[in-house]
């Protein structure tokens, strides 16, 4: 069951003081407002490498989180997940962004902070691995992530892989930024 504070936010949603600056930075980079086929392909790669049915490249601004890159395996169950846009207090990526560290949840129901989240209740997500996308300015823009509808052991290898994919994607983002500046 999902629980809300009187403010309408999920309980235990992290305070994100960097959201206003991140929103400006995402606009500068042209990220987080539209679907990006290159990022869809990158999400597909995340899913393949981590052998996960769902994967995404997620950017989080002041208003929402947006999966500019998203992959749903053809043989994965249709559960209403994943969606391109989610409220900031749904899912696990906002926690990765605020913590500035990767997060592995082998069974999300084992953690009170995450067990009552809407993506558990409404979409059946049971397992998550995500790593932050930290740019050259030290701003965490969003995440790369993979989820499963079954509990699973991502292990240290899965964590290392998510971090490596995040670093690779940050290099792509930097190359895009350099091309914009050279313009």
Each model region followed by its residue ranges:
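A short, aliphatic-rich beta-strand micro-motif
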Residues: 126-135
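Residue-level recognition of short loop/turn positions
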Residues: 99, 136-137
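PAS/LOV and related PAS-like sensory modules
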Residues: 1, 24-28, 183
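Helix-loop-beta substructure at the N-terminus of cytosolic sensory domains
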Residues: 33-68
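Regulatory sensory and allosteric helical modules in signal-transduction proteins
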Residues: 25, 54, 60-68, 76-126
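Juxtadomain coupling helices with adjacent low-complexity linkers
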Residues: 6-12, 16-19, 147-183
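Sensory beta-strand/linker motifs that couple input domains to effectors
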Residues: 137-148
């Amino acid at each position: 069951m999902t629980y809300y504070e009187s403010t309408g936010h999920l309980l235990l949603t992290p305070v994100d003081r960097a959201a206003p600056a991140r929103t400006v930075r995402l606009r500068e980079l042209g990220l987080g407002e539209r679907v990006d086929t290159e990022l869809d392909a990158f999400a597909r790669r995340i899913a393949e490498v981590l052998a996960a049915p769902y994967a995404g490249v997620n950017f989080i601004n002041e208003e929402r989180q947006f999966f500019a890159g998203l992959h749903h395996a053809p043989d994965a169950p249709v559960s209403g997940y994943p969606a391109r846009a989610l409220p900031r207090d749904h899912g696990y990526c906002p926690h990765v962004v605020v913590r500035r560290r990767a997060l592995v949840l082998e069974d999300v129901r084992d953690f009170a902070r995450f067990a009552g989240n809407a993506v558990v209740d409404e979409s059946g997500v049971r397992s998550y691995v995500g790593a932050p996308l930290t740019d050259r300015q030290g701003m965490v823009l969003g995440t790369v992530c993979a989820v499963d509808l079954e509990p699973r052991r991502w292990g240290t290898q899965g964590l290392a892989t998510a971090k490596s994919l995040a670093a690779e994607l940050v290099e792509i983002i930097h190359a895009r930024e350099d091309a914009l500046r050279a313009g």
